[in-house]
Amino acid sequence: MTKNGIDVSEWQGDIDWSRVRTDFAILRAGYGREVSQKDKKFERNYSGAKANNIPCGAYWYSYAVSEDEARKEASACIEIIKGKQFEYPIYFDVEEQKIFDLGRDKVSKIIEAFCHELEKAGYFAGLYMSAYPLTKYTTEHVKRRYAVWVANYDVSKPDYSGPYGIWQKSSSGIVDGIAGNVDVDVCYTDYPTVIKNLGDNGFPKHTAPAHTKKTMKVTVEYDDHTYSGLLEEQ
């Protein structure tokens, strides 16, 4: 299964979502530690995507250089996205060199701190990074623990050997309804099904008596890799 998508922020201006043709969209919710740092177009983009039946996820751009700062960023992110439904993960966007300068173990702890807060609040957490820092500055546990969205341009496939669900392949896409260039992505994972089955990201959790619960096999495809696991009905 392959889906083609885009990711957007206030830098794309006022998007005419009625003209956009895409399988999914990842929206910037905001950045930093304060609710006041919400992306100026987030509400408009969320409403526009939903009104036009475009499944969406969200991302939060990080400046955190400690676990405590990461938790504060998570709190701001959760405040902004609460009450909404997302078919795709909520991603922690790590790009700042000052974060990478802390080293792999510290970077990984910062990622875990943010994602743990998201999961506690009922969200399906993911990590966005470029291929090189993702390889160099995260532990194997982090690479496999969270949904990975990897950025790598001008290549036929990402220069990254770990599992990933979405590949951001270019920043120069042209999409009707959006003025100027936009990031374009390819998704290999059926996140909407997984997230809805889990009851994450604002979707209702399905409960049933213990004796009627079923266990289903979920297969997640990551480019050349396929990972399977068991998911119990909630």
Where are the language model's segments positioned?
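Substrate-binding cleft of extracellular glycoside hydrolase catalytic domains
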Residues: 1-115, 119-124
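Functionally critical loop-and-helix segments that line ligand-binding/catalytic clefts
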Residues: 1-18, 141-211
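Flexible, glycine-rich phosphate/dinucleotide-binding loops
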Residues: 34, 65, 134, 157, ...
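Short beta-strand/turn micro-motifs composed of small residues
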Residues: 60, 129, 152
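Glycine-rich, charge-decorated loop segments at or immediately adjacent to ligand/cofactor-binding or catalytic sites
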Residues: 69-72, 133-143
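Structural recognition of alpha->loop->beta junctions
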Residues: 78-92, 96-98, 137-164
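Aromatic-lined carbohydrate-recognition surfaces of secreted/lumenal glycan-active proteins
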Residues: 118-136
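Short, low-complexity, charged amphipathic interaction modules
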Residues: 207-234
